[in-house]
Amino acid sequence: MRTSVCIKGTGSNFMRMSLMGLMLTVMSQVNAQQFNSDSWLSKPHGVMTIIPTFGERSSMLMNTFSLLPRWEFTMAAYLYNSDKDNTTDDGYSTSFYAKYMIYENPMQNGGFAVKAGTGTFPGTIDPDLREKDAFKTYWMNAPITIPFYDNKLSWDIMPGASFTRNFGPEETTAWSFTYSTRVAYNPWGPKFSVVGELFGTEGETGTLPEYKVGLRYDVSPNATFAFTYGQEFTDNNGAGFEIGAMLFTPPFVKIGKGEKQKHEYQ
């Protein structure tokens, strides 16, 4: 998960236009991944990942920096379009978090990690809360990746927990359990995958469970495109159609010397 900052009015309009302009600039060179689930993998030391996503409910620009071996540091901005009307301002939010890869198997196709931060991914917190002040919701989760069938099937599991400060009229601390799981199936080779995902939150700040299905195409070890459709199981306020990309830079943004790694990014 991740927390929310949402501001409306003139300042929000300026931020909205600035972020959209930056997204459009980046999108001309990149490819995306708009899933809530994550894998065990931390990108090789020094790699910067740029992830723009355009969708019906929200659009996103996420930047991840692998400044240290096994570590990733991420910041993201989300532009909301709750009423499906692009001419109105539905606010924006931000999230900041870190990830540490604890274990990787000898085949380098599975393992587990831990993530922690503030700011929520769209669909993982009550919509009313994402429009409150920043740094109210904090979270931690553990991405686990298990490969099957000679690496043709990859299963990501990501249990976690969150707490929101000053929740409700009594301004209590609200706790929730977060869950997310994703399956990627690539019977035609490693580049093309069919992906399905389920995620949600149970607790005081809970949400309706959502699903997301789509196609992911790994153009190269440095670029991945994804086209998805997401919806709530019992309502129609899900993500809708989304198109996104991931771009991985050469390893130049780093602190110190790192380990030699050989990966296809996920």
Where are the language model's segments positioned?
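Cleavable N-terminal export/targeting peptides
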Residues: M1-N36, F252-Q266
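Transmembrane beta-barrel domains of Gram-negative outer membranes and organellar outer membranes
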Residues: A32-P169, A174-T228, E232-Q266
